[in-house]
Amino acid sequence: MNIRPLHDRVIIKREEVETRSAGGIVLTGSAATKSTRAKVLAVGKGRILENGTVQPLDVKVGDTVIFNDGYGVKNEKIDGEEVLIISENDILAIVE
């Protein structure tokens, strides 16, 4: 993938969701919701502050994150791969 997000943007790939419960029941409809966990594929250089300095992002390529899947999330297909472009503000946590 040859893409570089700008400023505080992050490109992520959503993790697959389990389609079976722990008991082996196949989940469908609202029970099989989209995952809000993703792998970070690329990050911008950072947020530009009012004084003109650049604040580096807290996330890095390879991190697994939990994100807010709402307004401001941009779905794209790059090199045949479904990815999301989000602001770092939409990342709620880094899974360690």
From Swiss-Prot:
Family matches, as SMART domains: Cpn10
SUPFAM superfamilies the UniProt entry points to: GroES-like (SSF50129)
The keyword Chaperone is annotated on this UniProt entry: yes
Keyword vocabulary terms for this entry: Chaperone, Cytoplasm
Record-annotated disulphide pairs: none
One cellular component (GO) term of this entry: cytoplasm
Subcellular location: Cytoplasm
UniProt cross-references to Pfam families, sorted A to Z: Cpn10
Location, primary (coarse class): cytoplasm
Protein's GO biological process: chaperone cofactor-dependent protein refolding
Listed InterPro entries: Chaperonin_GroES, Chaperonin_GroES_sf, Chaprnonin_Cpn10_CS, GroES-like_sf
GO molecular function: ATP binding; metal ion binding; protein folding chaperone; protein-folding chaperone binding; unfolded protein binding
Binding partners and assembly: Heptamer of 7 subunits arranged in a ring. Interacts with the chaperonin GroEL.
Function noted in UniProt: Together with the chaperonin GroEL, plays an essential role in assisting protein folding. The GroEL-GroES system forms a nano-cage that allows encapsulation of the non-native substrate proteins and provides a physical environment optimized to promote and accelerate protein folding. GroES binds to the apical surface of the GroEL ring, thereby capping the opening of the GroEL channel.
Protein family (similarity comment): Belongs to the GroES chaperonin family.
Name of the molecule in the record: Co-chaperonin GroES
Naturally occurring in which organism (per UniProt): Haemophilus influenzae (strain PittGG)
